[in-house]
Amino acid sequence: MDLTSKNYLKWVANKRCIYHGTAETVVPHHIRSLRLGAGMGIKAPDINTIPVCHECHTNCHNGTIDLETQLMWCLQTINNALAEGEIQYG
């Protein structure tokens, strides 16, 4: 998968919130971290995206939901994408 993928972002946006399980107002949240190849002025790769509701999106940005939790959710999202054939390994 390329670093940017509109199809993957659309797929993420159509999922339920990874934490609350709600389907209303789900937005793709890019996990931004210098360790993950993103930071100030640098967009995170789309593979580092998780489906979250507005509340969780706010909490990801304000630090209430820590980076470790976001990364765990990212792995779950990638596993789901692999299982559904949205992305392929290799």
PLM features: what roles do these ranges have?
Residues 11-14, 22, 33, 60, ...:
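Generic signature of intrinsically disordered, low-complexity segments enriched in small/polar residues
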